[in-house]
Amino acid sequence: MVQQIRIASYNVENLFSRPRALNQPEPVAAAILRAHARVNELFEQEVYTPAVKAEMLQLLKELKLLRDDGDATRTSTFAILRRIRGRLLRRPQNDPDGSQVTVVASGRSAWTGWVDLIKDRIDEKAITNTARVIREVGADIVGIVEAEDRLTLARFTDSLLLDPATADPIYPHVMVIDGNDPRGIDVGILSTAAFPMARMRSHIDDGLFGDRVFSRDCPEYWFAFPAGSALAGQQLVVLVNHFKSKFGGNNPASVARRKRQSKQTADIYNALRTAGVEHIVVLGDFNDTPDSEALRPLLVETDLTDIASVQPFDDGDPDEDRPGTFGNGTRSSKIDYLLLSPSLRARANGAGIFRKGVWGGVNGTLFPHFDTIEAEHQAASDHAALYVGIDLD
């Protein structure tokens, strides 16, 4: 008989590969990501006006794609121009600085192509340590943030998360729905054999066309509590999310985007409650603090409860009060969440932050981490994992 379920949330910061730009200092990375997003947006224009062409050339210059289409072997290159059909640019041969490059395509119909971010493979020890975090947390259901895609996540679990007694995958149920992020930073879920997914629903299309609410998605994953438990046959819904980042600056547009995402997630949650679903978890990386205006619709204006209020609660640092979930775990870095509906909060019997996969400080000495992490680049993630136990007896 299943007497307890453990649920976790973990931003793995990609499993096998990650955009090279994200390894740069934040101002550099933010500029590259903005240029990448904007130039692809301009490519979709029906007509390339002189102003559009001028902006394209400036963005391609910032991405170092004026003189050629990019070369992944050059460590200073962060993007590649993919050209499938037609011609976008005229590049004179004797033009070392690219000042003579022109846009010759008249609009979207004249050519097919886009700009991709170059990805680098993640350190092998970091990958192994990511698996170790998930194994040691020991959750039955894990909400995953920043996974490349379903096949990558399945390959990760099938090779690194095996039952030592049977050699079977600990998490045979793996799902990632491709979201709205072009960089391959999606959200997904893992579950054990005792908790197969009953159904799922995506929210990638919430909002008007061209103005999607969610940066990735807010998928609903539905499960049934197992036979023999106190909640046998009843439904459990897990919502996984990754709100707009503060990366590159917390400007008013960024705050407004997160608030809109928070409000939409709250609306999805409230609709489920109205439909009679009692047992709901909302989790993920919300990229803002509990006192932020952006998260108010979700944290204040619903009856969801943060697991930080569950007792006993282990913050992952035996010596300090460390409520944060990112980096050094300070109060201002509490950006990851695991929220419970009232019925689940009433059954919660313990929760915590698992930060042994995080480096912590300049020298990795702020709090205990795995002995297999000998340098910062070997850390599993900059994010700690969150977990909660729910009594099913």
Question: Would you name each region that the model predicts?
Answer:
Residues 1-6, 19, 201-215, 222-223, ...:
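Metal-dependent phosphoester-hydrolase catalytic domains
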Residues 113-121, 138-145, 176, 207-209, ...:
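Second-shell loop/turn segments in exported
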Residues 149-151, 181-186, 246-248, 287-293, ...:
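Active-site environment of divalent metal-dependent phosphoester hydrolases
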